[in-house]
Regions:
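Glycine-rich, proline-tolerant flexible connector loops at the mouths of alpha/beta enzymes
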Residues: 94-108
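A short acidic, glycine/proline-enriched capping/turn motif at secondary-structure boundaries
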Residues: 88, 97-99, 137-139
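Active-site region of glycoside hydrolase catalytic domains
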Residues: 2-59, 83, 102-104, 113-477
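Active-site mouth loops of central-metabolism enzymes
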Residues: 60-74, 151-153
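Catalytic domains of carbohydrate-active enzymes, especially glycoside hydrolases
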Residues: 74-95, 303-307
Length: 477
């Protein structure tokens, strides 16, 4: 492996999401969102998948997002911790329902705007550049119950109004924007991804892809708006990344892997290239999907993103017969268990070379700068008798992936920056657990909402501080 060299001005930092960190789920005039309806425990996955509709909260269930890690009230202290590590970028999201509590109002909630302005000003104080996602798995529930969420074309108007409000309110404080977090998760986890709930008569593929069309048009429209408001604004898309390997060199397995890659890359094909890919027509025909277009949609889609951002935790594996092989249920994106790579405690593959492969595949395809905005290892952390957390396993994972990212840069790929996921421990989106920890900072909170919420620096905190100070040159453990 060659010596890792990162460009001058490379952005180093970490990422959180409003719905997994803020808590205070009704404070400051905020409205309910989809994630506020997703409980911890056995019902979590059926609700996330849209198979078990939830329109009201239940007294007998625990909802992790309601309190999360209390970032809403502790953000100044948390940003100070990020500054101590030397962050130059902090990725977070704006909760749509803090700005428009129902989602369809004509005027925004001033308390929500004031909160985020204060948050971004705090970042500015420390020289930390915000990277802001407009919708991170938290559609206002009113838009779900009254409009059917993204199956309804009216959502384009509501999202555009919300985005314009944010671009105006935070102009000069935020210039890097993402429209939808992991937009392809709509296909795999429809309720959490896009607020979709299915009826017994629905053609689910039709509903999902029509909703996807509305999101893609909305994304292009707000990209256009962002550039009109301030030409300095840069807007990116965001993919739940990870390439598919074929199970074998059997051509049928190779084709199956390519189809699975296309299923996920379809969204970025539209957002980065400005039109539906040619292969989509056959996919739609074979699935009985008929997308309803309106005049002007094709023209809007030509407003492509400035950069391509993505998450990468693990590669994936596909076969022509996914049911006969050893399938992994580690994440909502179905994959076979690759016998050639180690796995985390939650069954996620650990494959740093897969990151380099994914980055090369995406840059070959899009020829736009890349931004790795989620990467990390979910693991159980133990506090020793001295109150310390020695998370060498996390350091090892991140070191290997930073090296792989450096190799991708050496391959000629322009990479804007790197934000590790859950830089401060947060509620895991997939499981709702706190015990699945990603952070450099430990949060005293358990899976049932108990704990002081006190913050403790882990060993990885000091390691990442050294990495940033050396611009990625010193990865020694």
């Amino acid at each position: 492996m060659s010596e890792v060299t990162f460009p001058e001005g490379f952005l180093w930092g970490g990422a959180l999401a409003a719905n997994q960190s803020e808590g205070s789920y009704l404070a400051g005039g905020k409205g309910l969102t989809t994630v506020d309806m997703i409980p911890h425990g056995e019902h979590r996955m059926p609700v996330k998948l849209g198979l078990e509709p939830r329109f009201t909260l239940r007294d007998d269930e625990y909802y992790p997002s309601h309190d999360a890690i209390d970032f809403y009230r502790r953000y100044k202290d948390d940003i100070a911790l990020m500054a101590e590590m030397g962050f130059t970028v902090f990725r977070t999201s704006i909760a749509w329902s803090r700005i428009y509590p129902k989602g369809d109002e004509l005027t925004p909630n001033p308390e929500g705007i004031a909160f985020y302005r204060s948050l971004f000003e705090e970042c500015q104080k420390y020289g930390i550049t915000p990277l802001v996602t407009l919708c991170h798995f938290d559609v206002p529930m009113h838009l779900v119950t009254e409009y059917g969420s993204w199956r309804n074309r009216k959502m384009i108007e509501f999202f555009a109004r919300y985005a314009r409000t944010c671009f105006d309110a935070f102009n000069g404080l935020v210039k890097y924007w993402l429209t939808f977090n992991e937009i392809n998760i709509l296909l795999h986890s429809p309720f959490s991804g896009a607020g979709l709930v299915f009826g017994s008569e629905d053609n689910r593929e039709q509903v999902k892809y029509q909703a996807a069309h509305h999101e893609l048009v909305a994304s292009a429209l707000v990209t256009k708006i962002a550039h009109e408001i301030d030409p300095e604004n840069q807007v990116g898309c965001m993919l739940a990344g990870g390439n598919f390997y074929p199970w074998s060199c059997n051509p049928e397995d190779v084709w199956a892997a390519m189809e699975k890659d296309r299923e996920n890359l379809f969204f970025i094909d539209v957002q980065a290239r400005g039109a539906y890919p040619s292969y989509a027509a056959r996919v739609f025909r074979e699935k009985g999907i008929e997308i309803e277009w309106q005049d002007g949609d094709a023209e809007l889609l030509r407003h492509t993103v400035d950069f391509v951002s993505f998450s990468y935790y693990a590669s994936r594996c596909a076969s022509a017969d996914m049911n006969e092989k050893n399938s992994s249920a580690a994440n909502v994106v179905k994959s076979l268990t690759n016998p050639h790579i180690p796995r985390s405690a939650w069954g996620w593959g650990i494959d740093p070379l897969g990151l380099r492969i994914t980055m090369n595949m995406m840059y070959d395809r899009y020829q736009k700068p890349l931004f790795l905005v989620e990467n990390g290892l979910g693991a159980r952390d133990e506090i020793d008798a001295n109150g310390e957390i020695h998370d060498d396993y996390r350091i090892s994972y991140l070191k290997q992936h930073i090296q792989a990212m450096g190799e991708a840069i050496a391959d000629g790929i322009p990479v804007m920056g790197y934000t590790t996921w859950g830089c401060i421990d947060l509620v895991a989106a997939s499981t709702g657990e706190m015990s699945k920890r990603y952070g450099f900072v430990y949060v005293d909170r358990d899976d049932h909402g108990n704990g002081s919420l006190a913050r403790t620096r882990k060993k990885s905190f000091w390691w990442y501080k050294k990495v940033i100070a050396s611009n990625g040159c010193d990865l020694s453990e």
